[in-house]
């Protein structure tokens, strides 16, 4: 089973002090939600996260993306260039040269190319808490460096107890307009 390691926190993922440009990990659902609220934001609902990750909405997207198209992966039609354990193209279980400054785990935000809607790291890198789920179980989306590319597809949904605190789950905040 899992064991908690001394010194492994959101301030020090894998026991090494975090940098400002890293995803925040080792946070429970409630802690992530509190961090978003502190910034006047919130965790996205599942349908919001899915729309942002898979449905291109930009009026003039760059080459490789088409407005109104729903993509298989947050990076487009493949998981190429996302950061995951297997099936992410030229990364093959590793990040770009020099990106894994700890030697293991997630990479700094915006290390991989932008995907659907110009968003970074929606597929791979770290699972993201979404504000959907019943009771003590909450959903995560997007897959992570710890999982294969097939965990990044829209139909793949993971749930975890809301008090889960691990190095491969993070979050992103959204703001109502």
Feature locations, PLM:
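Short, structured beta-strand segments at or near domain termini in extracellular proteins/domains
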Residues: 167-177
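Functional-site microenvironments in short loops/helix caps that host divalent-cation chemistry
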Residues: 1-158, 167
């Amino acid at each position: 089973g899992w064991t908690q390691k001394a010194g492994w926190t959101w301030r020090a993922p894998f026991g090494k002090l975090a940098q400002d440009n890293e995803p925040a990990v080792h946070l429970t659902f409630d802690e992530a939600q509190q961090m978003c609220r502190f910034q006047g934001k919130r965790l996205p609902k599942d349908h919001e996260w899915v729309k942002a990750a898979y449905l291109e909405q930009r009026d003039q997207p760059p080459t490789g993306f088409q407005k109104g198209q729903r993509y298989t992966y947050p990076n487009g039609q493949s998981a190429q260039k996302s950061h995951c354990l297997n099936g992410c193209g030229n990364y093959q279980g590793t990040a770009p040269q020099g990106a894994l400054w700890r030697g293991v785990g997630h990479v700094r935000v915006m290390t991989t190319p932008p995907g659907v809607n110009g968003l970074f790291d929606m597929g791979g890198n770290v699972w993201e808490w979404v504000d959907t789920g019943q009771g003590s179980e909450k959903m995560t989306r997007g897959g992570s460096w710890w999982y294969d590319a097939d965990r990044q597809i829209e139909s793949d949904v993971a749930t975890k107890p809301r008090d889960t605190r691990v190095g491969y789950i993070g979050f992103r905040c959204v703001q109502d307009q």
